[in-house]
Amino acid sequence: MRRGLLLALVLVLALPASALAHATLEATTPARGAVARAEPAQVVLRFDEAVEGNFGAVRVFDARGARVDDGRVVHPGGTGALLAVGLKPGLPHGSFTATYRVISADGHPVSGGFVFAIGHAGAAPAATVGDLLGGTSAGPVTQAAFGLARGADYLAIALVVGTLLFGLLAWPRDAAGPAAEHAFARRSRTVLAAGLGMGAAAGVAGIVLQGATAGGTSFWAALDPGVVREVLGTRFGAVWGLRLADLVLLGGALLVFGPRRPGAWALPAALLAITPALGGHAATQHPVALLVPLDVAHVVAMSVWVGGLVVLLVAVPAATRALDPPARAVLLGATVTRFSTIALASVATLLLTGTVQSIVHLRAFDDLLHTAFGRAVLIKVGLVLALIALGAVNRRRSVPRLRALAREGHAPGAAGRLLRRTLRAEVALAVVVLGVTAALVSYAPPSALSAGPFSHSTRTGPLEVEATVDPARTGVNAVH
């Protein structure tokens, strides 16, 4: 029974705080492969969710590969799921290729294309959809850098929120003298400064890298002020810009009032924990009123756990060194006992929030084995399992031993060294888990992969072959 519950816990914890599905093209006007009798005024694309049409989102090319759209991309009727681009007047009869590169609600670019004709189907286009989109995708270095920026962003939130809550909930001021209190405060400020600096750097890099990814350009090209303005005009840019401003506000509050005045930092710290939900599908997928609070609770629980581990490793030892050896065990035992209880509550919160989110986002257990998203989850399963095992070692061995040493008036000794070793391993694993989480958000979950038409085009000699399966769901499908 215990093993089954542990496995369920690990599987749930391995799921991302907010599954990030990608937009899917559902229909087009003119239809894919259709022959329009008269020239349409515009090409319209309908997606399964609201998308953003920055960065030259929709383009139309004639058979020779020359652009024939007017470059003005709009949302018809203000509907976020619709995108349209006007066509230049007086187009000749023949085949045309429309391509799209849009931004999903989760901030990820989605691209594709289709062929249609006006009057009659003319010569096959000189370039395939893949050829026309080939120069508009970010390279592997940009994608890897974006993953690092996301991971650093998660770690920064954990460091800042976790350190503040550790000092408020887990630090036993009644067991610490002035010297220990001063040492703890000094090291805590160092952790907070590192988190704030990392968050600011990750935020700036993330905005630029989003411009490179969405526009299919290099990092250096995305430094252009025009590209940055376009990113800030998207939902992704608004959320990441808000987080940057919030980090500045929080840093100012901590600089003026210090971490011991929660009234000064509570609001910006809460906003920092809310922003991941605002930037993901929790804020756009039904039921929003349930998913957003769950996502925020998930982030706070993660921050308490991961940030608390860092404080235990960095700030608490500095505080104990300021005391006589017998008093060290008392302070260390009291701190670890409090944090152990809080960490257990955090794990329970992660279990609850992850369970509900998994019900919303996952379709079948087989998806864990047969999708990139699922395989990434399985990797995270192993890491989380190791993390829980190390925490169990501390709870079952280190905590009781430290309590006993405190009662007997002895120094922490071997128990303290064991605690430090396991904490180092836990922090290292926690950082890797956050990195895997950053990688997970680049994959669409199985629920998104199972919806919408699938199209693929290829060139065979002088012919271009395009196959479309619509709607690419279980049941009746049309193949064109």
Task: Locate the predicted segments by residue.
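Contiguous beta-strand segments within globular domains
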Residues: A36-L45, R473-H480
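Bacterial N-terminal signal peptides that target proteins for export
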Residues: M1-L6
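Bacterial N-terminal signal peptides
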Residues: L7-P16
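Detector for glycine-centered tight turns/loop "hinges" at secondary-structure junctions
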Residues: G33, G65-A66, G107, P462
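Short proline/glycine- and polar residue-rich coil/turn motifs
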Residues: V74-G80
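Short N-terminal segments immediately surrounding and downstream of signal-peptide cleavage
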Residues: A23-A38
